[in-house]
Amino acid sequence: MTKEQIIEAVKNMTVLELNELVKAIEEEFGVTAAAPVVVAGGAAAGAEAAAEKTEFDVILADAGAQKIKVIKVVREITGLGLKEAKDLVDNTPKPIKEGIAKEEAEEIKAALEEAGAKVEIK
């Protein structure tokens, strides 16, 4: 029996049949299908994680008085169209970029602040 045939057979099973199959596999091979549980570390582990943060979010807190300049910068950074960039700038606070490197986040923050916006990096 090929993998494809096994997958096709599983696709055609009911939930009850799948449950029985899982139990049979657990008994046959001595394993469990339970998801692994991650134990939370103490305060020291939390401090290490905070110190090692590698991904940052750039949040536009306020567009300031020169919205047109800010919209232009947002369009350059995100590649959004005019309407989407304007909606983003008009509805602050909003994330501009998420999950980026610290250097890139700092560059984006500097460009937006130069245009008159208030920016946060989280």
From Swiss-Prot:
Domain of life: Bacteria
An annotated GO cellular component: cytosolic large ribosomal subunit
Keywords: Ribonucleoprotein, Ribosomal protein
GO biological process per UniProt: translation
InterPro entries the record matches: Ribosomal_bL12 (IPR000206), Ribosomal_bL12_C (IPR013823), Ribosomal_bL12_C/ClpS-like (IPR014719), Ribosomal_bL12_oligo (IPR008932), Ribosomal_bL12_oligo_N_sf (IPR036235)
One annotated GO molecular function: structural constituent of ribosome
Physiological role: Forms part of the ribosomal stalk which helps the ribosome interact with GTP-bound translation factors. Is thus essential for accurate translation.
Subunit record text: Homodimer. Part of the 50S ribosomal subunit; present in 4 copies per ribosome. Forms part of the ribosomal stalk which helps the ribosome interact with GTP-bound translation factors. Forms a pentameric L10(L12)2(L12)2 complex, where L10 forms an elongated spine to which 2 L12 dimers bind in a sequential fashion.
Family assignment from sequence similarity: Belongs to the bacterial ribosomal protein bL12 family.
PANTHER family cross-referenced by the UniProt entry: 39S RIBOSOMAL PROTEIN L12, LARGE RIBOSOMAL SUBUNIT PROTEIN BL12M
UniProt-recorded name of the protein: Large ribosomal subunit protein bL12
Organism this protein belongs to: Geobacillus stearothermophilus (Bacillus stearothermophilus)
Gene responsible for this protein: rplL
